[in-house]
Amino acid sequence: MQNIIFEYTLTSLQKFKDAGIEVDFVQIGNEITNGLLFPYGKIKNYGSDYQKFFDTAKFLEKGILATRQIFPETKIILHLDCSGDLNRCLWWFSCANQFDLDYDIIGLSYYSLWQGKDLRL
């Protein structure tokens, strides 16, 4: 699965480059709080933080590596949907940092219907 992610990302971004399109930002996955490409990259609910996050991190690494290979200066976004849960965000990015993921921007979704209208999140 890791190689598929790498090749797909590489091929997709190469098409942009071949068309003369510069890409400023790439978001690896979408709302990946619980992982990506379920069930393979789902964050586990057992084991150490390292074990829980391992598959997600390896998938993200491949997408990031392919992006950097085609567009080295492109900003990488990791996007979660838990902006109303500070502890979850802190845990998630502490895990991402344990794996030394190469990202530039933290993206967070905010849904007032579920997270309330208190903007002091």
Task: Explain the meaning of each model-derived region.
Residues 54, 65, 69-75, 86-121:
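Glycoside hydrolase catalytic-domain groove-lining segments
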